[in-house]
Amino acid sequence: MRFHAHMVLRSVCGPHAHMSTWPFFALVLFSKVIGHAALKAKLIGNIREGRVAHAQLFMGPRGGGNLAMALAYARYLLCQDRDTVDACGKCSSCLQMNKLEHPDVHLEFPIFFTDKVKVCEPFTPQWRQTVLAEPYLDVEQWRDRLESENKQLRMGVDIAQEIQRKLSLRSFMGGYKVMLIWLPELMDAAAANKLLKVLEEPEPNTVFLLVSTDAEQLLATILSRAQLVKVSALRPTELVEAL
């Protein structure tokens, strides 16, 4: 049986509890991501051994922790003083990741379009704030934060062009550039095809972290170019142990 993290939390702490009541979530380190010990060890080992795939698909059910895991991975990848189990949490890179403001970590996510706004940039401060409070964010929570009511959240060709523009920039700190795309399955066909072209001809030292809850909605050609990172559903015992 699958359990949404928020559902189990509320069953333990009460109907009004949510992830932001646990302040340790604000710093997304591997040690703060609930459960998934074997997967964490594998991801850490891959980085330490220099096996960093240029495109990785963090796939899992809603509320299972795939976004939190991808953020912890990005932090560890960019950490300047990481050890064998986690990022240091203290270097300049980690301090920037504490606020999701690392200049080499680019964030893309679905939005609702207006006549004037069709890219993520104007929404980025709000998305950062939301994710820092709710690393187990799902699309309904994000829609509520945007107060978009019944408007459709999506990613259009303008966002794909925004991705290309960001990737054309040099690495600010001279290492990896990370492009984290949350819910790429909400890209329209034109945007997905543009993303595919970027994945086919990646810039050096660029890592794509695609965070998805519905791989069936992604282009098969995108799936074929991304290394699968399967983030399984949380068990209620894992969430209770984290309290």
Task: Please tell me what each predicted stretch does.
Residues 225, 241-243:
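Conserved AAA+ ATPase "sensor/coupling" helix adjacent to the nucleotide-binding pocket
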Residues 182-183, 210-215, 235:
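A short beta-strand-to-loop transition that corresponds to the Sensor-1 phosphate-sensing loop
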Residues 194-199, 215-225:
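Short regulatory helix/loop adjacent to the ATP-binding pocket of P-loop NTPases
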Residues 5-7, 14-19, 26:
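Short hydrophobic alpha-helical segments enriched in small aliphatic residues
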Residues 173-178, 203-209:
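Loop/turn-to-beta-strand initiation segments
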Residues 189-190, 204, 220:
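Conserved D-loop-proximal element of ABC-family nucleotide-binding domains
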Residues 29-190:
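Clamp-loader machinery-focused feature within the broader ASCE/P-loop NTPase space
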Residues 228-237:
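Conserved AAA+ ATPase "SRH/arginine-finger" region at the nucleotide-binding site
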